[in-house]
Swiss-Prot record:
Keywords on record: Acetylation, Cytoplasm, Endoplasmic reticulum, Isopeptide bond, Methylation, Microsome, mRNA processing, mRNA splicing, Nucleus, Phosphoprotein, Repeat, Ribonucleoprotein, RNA-binding, Spliceosome, Ubl conjugation
Chain spans, region 8 X 3 AA repeats of R-G-G: 358-469
The name this protein goes by in its record: Heterogeneous nuclear ribonucleoprotein Q
Region (3 X 4 AA repeats of Y-Y-G-Y): 370-398
């Protein structure tokens, strides 16, 4: 048996490296170059893991507490590629004691990949590092970006049978994945016995969540005889305590259908002057004039019965502009296939977007993530771990999995296409082909597919055209490529309409990585690196 000293620190027991150590294809090259065994193995780790780690538990004289928990790690982006630990560690040690630092490396060039993760011993040190070094000029003309790193341990799972309970879902998914700790499930407002067809699975840590995601997305695992829809959910971000200390708005959920804004105003006004009350489905926002009134109301009313339901109250999470920007980017990417969709943030009312009805182009709806309520309600994330924790979209964006005018109408007549600019374009349909649907009246110059459509100029829009005749499921005769459906493709699942899941933090790869585009990255890459491209 070959015996080797791997770590090079003090007296070591022999170990069988042939089975315990997995080397990359570059390991022999390093040995052939004359490098010592230990040095070659350390360098080979960079090829395998794609990172270089500094530190570990610091000496007891520096820190003798427990292992750091959530909120102690920061992400450092836009690092100059030729900058290493010898400059990063002294810089960040000024914010507090460091537990470890992981610098992502490019093994081919020996340079870093432009980002790193620093874990501090305390949350306070991590928050101080963000304040001190976000947009810090680390070299002349080179500014780094720093933010709290959030290890995502939640998965969105769609296509859940609506009759299943939280306990049944927890039991079923525990059979096929490891480390599942909780299930977050929402019920339909008008029928508390039924769920909304989706849930969130919470795992012990990001590593187990990533493994579960890969397993569930493999197509080999079926739950209740079906392959589910699985995506990353947005991770929970702890709000700034200084910001939360100023919040005067309460988020109230689990309201009965009979509860009105007038009832809420009467119930909460006894604790202080109200600026306004806004109820949406079975939740509401209560705006107080003073924070003291909001604090007192939450203490007195949380868990109390209101019109037959026990309400739950937390402070509403204020706007996070960076999260809104990320949401806008994800939403724009999700809707690239949709015609005439652009993101408009509150408080401006967006113009209506086209529905997906096929005859007469359907009715008009609003963008999928616009909820119709005023001003900044869309910004609130309801950061509460027992429901909707930290997620930006109110869960009513998933209501019955139907948003706006998404229904398919009958296909309209397939006549000549309109001219789209300065001059007539040739017709798209085949000459002499029969119409596909019944004729529809013109909507100005835009009507059913058989009629002429409006030019893409400054024409006058007239009345809406009717829907075309129903020829459900037939293919277009002229070879026109029909755009993909807005509905998520779920392998012919048959549990009713499918949900449109929260977008993952980046594309839909199956590796568990997100934020970075390298095949070498593993589960440790758990933050929003895409902010600093």
């Amino acid at each position: 048996m070959a015996t080797e000293h791997v770590n090079g620190n003090g007296t070591e027991e022999p170990m069988d490296t042939t089975s315990a150590v997995i080397h990359s294809e570059n390991f022999q090259t390093l040995l052939d170059a004359g490098l010592p065994q230990k040095v070659a193995e350390k360098l080979d780790e960079i090829y395998v893991a794609g990172q270089r780690k500094y530190g570990g538990p610091p000496p007891d004289s520096v820190y003798s507490g427990q292992q750091p928990s959530v909120g102690t790690e920061i992400f450092v982006g836009k690092i100059p590629r030729d900058l290493f630990e010898d400059e990063l560690v002294p810089l960040f040690e000024k914010a507090g004691p460091i537990w470890d630092l992981r610098l992502m490396m490019d093994p081919l060039t020996g340079l870093n990949r432009g980002y790193a993760f620093v874990t501090f011993c305390t949350k306070e040190a991590a928050q101080e590092a963000v304040k001190l070094y976000n947009n810090h000029e680390i070299r002349s003309g080179k500014h780094i970006g720093v933010c709290i790193s959030v290890a995502n341990n939640r998965l969105f799972v769609g296509s859940i049978p609506k009759s299943k309970t939280k306990e049944q879902i927890l039991e079923e998914f525990s059979k096929v994945t490891e480390g599942l700790t909780d299930v977050i499930l929402y019920h339909q407002p008008d029928d508390k016995k039924k769920n909304r067809g989706f849930c969130f699975l919470e795992y012990e840590d990001h590593k187990t969540a990533a493994q579960a995601r890969r397993r569930l997305m493999s197509g080999k695992v079926k739950v209740w005889g079906n392959v589910g829809t699985v995506e990353w959910a947005d991770p929970i971000e702890d709000p700034d305590p200084e910001v939360m200390a100023k919040v005067k708005v309460l988020f109230v959920r689990n309201l009965a259908n009979t509860v009105t804004e007038e009832i809420l105003e009467k119930s909460f006004s006894q604790f202080g002057k109200l600026e306004r009350v806004k109820k949406l489905k079975d939740y509401a926002f209560i705006h107080f004039d003073e924070r003291d009134g909001a604090v007192k109301a939450m203490e007195e009313m949380n868990g109390k019965d209101l019109e037959g339901e026990n309400i739950e109250i937390v402070f509403a999470k204020p706007p996070d502009q960076k999260r809104k920007e990320r949401k806008a980017q994800r939403q724009a990417a999700k809707n690239q296939m949709y015609d005439d969709y652009y993101y408009y943030g509150p408080p401006h009312m967006p113009p209506p977007t086209r529905g997906r009805g096929r005859g007469g182009r359907g009715g008009y709806g609003y963008p999928p993530d616009y909820y119709g309520y005023e001003d900044y309600y869309d910004y609130y994330g309801y950061d509460y771990h027992n429901y909707r924790g930290g997620y930006e979209d109110p869960y009513y964006g998933y209501e019955d999995f139907q948003v706006g005018a998404r229904g398919r109408g009958g296909r309209g007549a397939r006549g000549a296409a309109p001219s789209r600019g300065r001059g007539a374009a040739p017709p798209r349909g085949r000459a002499g082909y029969s119409q596909r649907g019944g004729p529809g009246s013109a909507r100005g110059v835009r009507g059913a597919r058989g009629g002429a459509q409006q030019q893409r100029g400054r024409g006058v829009r007239g009345a809406r055209g009717g829907r075309g005749g129903n020829v459900g499921g037939k293919r277009k005769a002229d070879g026109y490529n029909q755009p993909d459906s807005k509905r998520r493709q779920t392998n012919n699942q048959n549990w009713g309409s499918q949900p449109i899941a929260q977008q993952p933090l980046q594309g839909g790869d199956h590796s568990g990585n997100y934020g970075y585009k390298s095949e070498n990255e593993e589960f440790y890459q758990d933050t929003f690196g895409q902010q600093w491209k």
